[in-house]
């Protein structure tokens, strides 16, 4: 079942890249939220090397029992300040950085760990109250601040647009 689903997603990705004329690398992140460590091991055996977890504690538990090829672990869920000390040593990329205060804490913990923590700045492009993230207006200031931190490296943005049936409306959020 996992193999068939993975192959279908990989085909859709390849088709989308071809349609867009892209030849650069795209990373598939296998989200294993609420799945057992055996699911992580299965996707790793199928060649996936990047895993996304929503919760720090769940990732920590899986890492303790995971037995398979080396993986890159990403935190894709909201990161609370009180979880930064646990998150930084575990994750190669944190997708949900939404404040200067959080950047400060990540920088401090990363320095203690002797690493540069890769992050994505989360921007709430749709201004949805139900979603976390920087406002479009606050983004430049936080981005510039992040550049001053020696143990944080901004790799890009994480943006989630609202669901629309009509693709043209969705594209407006990313222009």
Where are these regions (language model features)?
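Conserved alpha/beta-domain cores
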Residues: 1-175
